[in-house]
Amino acid sequence: MSFVWFLVGFAAMVVFASFFEWTLHRFVLHRPLWFFRYPFNAHAMVHHRAFRADRTYHVQNRTDEGKIPMNWWNGPALILAGCLPFTGLAAFISWWFLLGAFAAACGYYTTYEYLHWCMHKPQHRLVERSGIFFVLNGHHLLHHRYMHKNFNVVLPLADLCLNTLLVRSKVCFAQARGDHVPDVQPRARSDT
């Protein structure tokens, strides 16, 4: 039974993490909080200024590489914060539930950082050749064009459920190009 609770905790955290990522991204990384401006400054003011939806979506110089990932201490802090609701539930259900949630939270954060790195610094890695990465890269590219849309990087479930999902641009723009970057321009209208 313990392995079942591990799997339930893991699956529940994957879904929860999509909404946690969305909430953090929308309300903390894109809005200055009067008592804690660091996340907004690091993300909206530094990351989004360095990486736009045009050719600058990809690293232009080595100094920009440090503007891709979050600071090292963000990972443990976010993983622990995300696991807090699961800790209370685990006290009543099973500690295996929390262990599964913790494993998923670690995997989700690691996946976030790795995919985000590959999106902004492409090097024809194996993951970059996958169809899932192709779709997620277009999703994230549109976020850099429309910062009020597409808050998820790993699993756009929350974007879908909370009506912030955008699959194509509404207007033409000079978007980033590359082997693993989809065309997110508006579809051409047919005259038929």
Predicted regions and their residues:
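Short, strongly hydrophobic alpha-helical membrane anchors
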Residues: 1-4
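Hydrophobic alpha-helical transmembrane segments
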Residues: 6-11, 98-102
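Membrane-embedded catalytic scaffold of the fatty acid hydroxylase/desaturase
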Residues: 17-102, 106-182
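A membrane-cytosol interface segment of integral membrane proteins
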Residues: 183-192
